[in-house]
From Swiss-Prot:
The gene is ligA. Its cofactor is Mg(2+); Mn(2+). This is DNA ligase. It catalyses: NAD(+) + (deoxyribonucleotide)n-3'-hydroxyl + 5'-phospho-(deoxyribonucleotide)m = (deoxyribonucleotide)n+m + AMP + beta-nicotinamide D-nucleotide. NAD(+) binds at residues 37-41, 86-87, 115, 138, 172, 288, 312. Zn(2+) binds at residues 406, 409, 424, 429. DNA ligase that catalyzes the formation of phosphodiester linkages between 5'-phosphoryl and 3'-hydroxyl groups in double-stranded DNA using NAD as a coenzyme and as the energy source for the reaction. It is essential for DNA replication and repair of damaged DNA. InterPro entries: BRCT_dom, BRCT_dom_sf, DisA/LigA_HHH, DNA_ligase, DNA_ligase_AS, DNA_ligase_CS, DNAligase_adenylation, DNAligase_N. Its EC number is 6.5.1.2.
Amino acid sequence: MKNVAQHDVEKQIAELREQIEKHNYAYYVLDQPSISDAEYDELMRKLMELEEQYPQYKTPDSPSQRVGGAPLEAFRKVTHRVPMLSLSNAFNEGDLRDFDRRVRQEVGDVRYVCELKIDGLAVSLRYEDGYFVQGATRGDGTTGEDITENLKTIRSLPLRLRQQVTIEVRGEAYMPRKSFEKLNEKRKMNGEELFANPRNAAAGSLRQLDPKVAASRQLDIFAYHVVNAEELGILSHSAALNYLDELGFKTNPARQVCETIDDVLSYIEQWHERRASLPYDIDGIVIKVDAFAQQKQLGATAKSPRWAIAYKFPAEEVVTQLVDIELSVGRTGVVTPTAILQPVRVAGTIVQRASLHNEDYIREKDIRLGDYVVIKKAGDIIPEVVCSLPERRTGKEEPFDMPTHCPACASELVRLDDEVALRCVNPQCPAQIREGLIHFVSRQAMNIDGLGEKVIAQLFEHRLVRSVADLYTLTKDELVALERMGEKSATNLLQAIEASKQNSLERLLFGLGIRHVGAKAAKTLAEHFETMERLQQATKEELMAIHEIGEKMADSIVTYFSKEEVKQLLERLRAYGVNMTYKGAKQTIDISSTFAGKTFVLTGTLQSMSRSEAKEKIETLGGKVTGSVSKKTDVVVVGEDAGSKLEKAKQLGITIWDEARFLQEIQQSKQV
């Protein structure tokens, strides 16, 4: 029997939870904050303090569970009770009218529900007796991954519903633009690779094994479908969305019921114009038959329902003025021109810079200083200049000529054989050294946390670092003298630098920035030669005998290790205790694997993994991945929104695998 004091504590905890969830709903779902951030933080602090003191009163639906628990070892596989199908796409008015005609021929009069197509990650959410018990990714549509702990960190997702109902809901997890911009700014400061777009950032966040990482990313979610709606007595999609509102889910308020296809087209036109004003990315409109009875009558193919279609917006193009062209020197010496623009909003973000690729591109497009230009942003971090608008010229515009000398060190620029880029070949070029340092400490290379671009710029400016080896001579006093570098940060950074000495050889190889040697080739070389010394002594012929090492890469490796300054650098790194041996397991390829010796091409978007993950799996199983389809291609792996590569594969009679077949072959090859 509980004593009075315990009863009071339990009551206090329950009241705190109720208050916090009420404020959560007001802030994250209704977008109407009811208290200040400081007041909210104080309520949360009190709750967590009480739950820490009285763990017997901690429950799975407590708001405290949203901060993220202990890291997971791996994601458990989840089989969807009802497959998560993808949608067929429409790209123009004709496609939509064809869809409407097919639907009406089958079911007669119909009304549609139009919804914004949120550019995020589809997830399945299962509740039992009103409590959130499991969340999973779409995966291949049949099997996904259990990401329950990461989904719990999304503040707008209810952990307990307003009714004790058992329900399965589908939703779209996404990253708002402000959260995306903050995240990329932080990653840039830390010298980490930037996310290309909010969708990739959301997907990457939900696939973190540490829920605290997901909690820090400020994700959001819209619920859009009730899987077992008819069991609950719901007869239409619009009614199901209203029911989700009643339960406490966040649904998209922009949805609209349309009686005709013309109403649908008006809705699409309206949101095509307004999409930039939204605080999140959308890439189209989803159109669904409203009545469940008609949905059932229309049925589905193996891949997609016949009662729904997704209209995809074309990539957004806008016009602005090019005010200048800025030149930057990369770590390999390539001089890249970037357009400096009058600020303009594209796809919801303010753009001031756009890629101009190279000198040939500027000349072919006749792009001049002062021109009005068309820019396009289709998922890339930096948009590109599509073309200039000569008809808007006033006569004041000036043709742009690439310089003959490096903007960073004044050395003469050269254009190597078969290259369009101009290159600075001075190994002492400060811009190349600085960019090389940023590459060396990056996540895929030596992974030195805390050494972002701004810190490296300061180290460079204070002449503390002129080579990657200098990083291993830094002292605490030198670091503390830097701007915004306290004692604790300096200590952490020195520990990270020290820890990097134990990295396996492939990380060091990639970090050195040998021309043509990417992360995968570095792993191959490290695995084959096992020590830096053996690799340094390798001949061109020995290198070319290795699968995936071609003549160009072999020449580059031999040239690199023959340089006196490289030999001196490696000697310094050895002296400082940097590991130069391969620590991984020797890879053996089973020649009976379906992948062994075959050439693959990837096209479209895979739901279960990224393009780079798919490439790595193929290569691990003995296959090779190329970027274009030819007669030498053995298999084309097709994801959603596959393009011209799929058509070419069909024309050439090349074997085509969908994602389900691809995953099946991977599994079978692992079991061989």
